[in-house]
């Protein structure tokens, strides 16, 4: 763990996959990852209830309904962002999920609007309907519209303009709700600025590409002054985690894990060697988790970690 207190959200998983697929494939997690929220996609209350019940049995702390994904595939399934047109149906879904998983918080993630709509009121109506008809009190708001036509999912994360002011206004008008802002947030200073207006901040791609951004979050945002994880500790934990996953015999190979580690040494001398070694097909083929430590040695030699923080030797 880089941060002990920050919530981790899974990728969106179709409720049908959870119900009819291999539950371990979609729901199994490491106990050290908590608090963790499972994000579900779907629009059938009964299916979402079944998926929520399974998630609760796997120890998830929260179950989040995605009402923000704009991809054509998701639209064909009549869920994701297009659900913002169906607040009553979303309410039925949330209520069914909560009844099936009473020990979990049930939340919703959505956009500020659809297509090129610029009026604030439909957003307020959507949130107001859910606040009135369900026990949901946490709303994670991506501060962009979802364009249902004309943009790819990737473009939908960048092209529609950000309207942070709409999310701030939601918090002012619904002070009893927990409003969490998402979209285009990349630095700790930006996080701190948003927290002057809303209850929480969700950071997505920046954490994936630069995970050590999270290293100081416990101190900065949770008041936990314990020493953050060192780079050396993290490399050792990654090696142990990879070894455990390989030993579990579920078909996982080192390449499947290592590709998600590439950003961990972002900004350090030797980061290029780290990325190269952990993406080299020949080096990965033996499935030897010690490769992680060998890659770490390249970074360690190129930086001074004597006081716990890296100082480039160049």
Model regions and ranges:
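Active-site beta-loop-alpha junctions enriched in small/polar residues
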Residues: 13-15, 41-43, 68-70, 111-115, ...
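Glycine/Thr-rich phosphate-binding loops of Rossmann-like dinucleotide-binding domains
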Residues: 18, 73, 116, 149, ...
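Non-cysteine beta-strand/loop elements that form the S-adenosyl-L-methionine
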Residues: 10, 61-71, 133-146, 203-207
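Glycine- and other small-residue-rich loops at beta-strand/loop junctions that grip anionic moieties
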Residues: 40, 82, 86, 109, ...
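Glycine-rich, positively charged N-terminal anion/phosphate-binding segment
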Residues: 1-61
């Amino acid at each position: 763990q880089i941060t002990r207190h920050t919530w981790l959200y899974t990728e969106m998983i179709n409720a049908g996959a959870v119900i009819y697929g291999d539950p371990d494939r979609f729901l199994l997690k490491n106990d050290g990852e908590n608090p963790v929220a499972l994000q579900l996609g779907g629009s059938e209350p009964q299916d979402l209830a079944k998926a929520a019940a399974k998630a609760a049995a796997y120890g998830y702390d929260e179950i989040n309904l995605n009402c923000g994904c704009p991809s054509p595939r998701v639209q064909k399934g009549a869920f994701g962002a297009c659900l913002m047109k169906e607040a009553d149906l979303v309410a039925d879904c949330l209520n069914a999920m909560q009844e099936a998983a009473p020990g979990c918080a049930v939340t919703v993630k959505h956009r500020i609007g659809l297509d090129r709509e610029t009026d604030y009121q439909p957003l307020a109506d959507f949130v107001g309907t859910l606040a009135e008809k369900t026990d949901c009190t946490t709303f994670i708001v991506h501060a962009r519209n979802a364009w249902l036509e004309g943009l790819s999912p990737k473009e939908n994360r960048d092209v529609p303009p950000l309207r942070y002011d709409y999310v701030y206004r939601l918090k002012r008008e619904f002070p009893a709700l927990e409003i969490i802002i998402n979209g285009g947030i990349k630095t700790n200073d930006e996080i701190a600025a948003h927290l002057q207006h809303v209850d929480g901040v969700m950071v997505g791609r920046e954490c994936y590409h630069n995970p050590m951004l999270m290293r100081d979050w416990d101190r900065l945002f949770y008041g936990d002054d314990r020493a953050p994880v060192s780079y050396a500790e993290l490399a050792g934990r990654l090696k142990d985690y990879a070894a455990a996953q390989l030993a579990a015999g579920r078909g996982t190979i080192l390449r499947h894990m290592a590709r998600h580690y590439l950003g961990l040494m972002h900004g350090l001398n030797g980061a290029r060697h780290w990325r190269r070694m952990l993406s080299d097909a020949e080096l990965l083929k033996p499935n030897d988790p010690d490769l992680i430590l060998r890659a770490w040695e390249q970074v360690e030699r190129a930086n001074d970690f004597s006081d716990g923080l890296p100082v480039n030797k160049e």
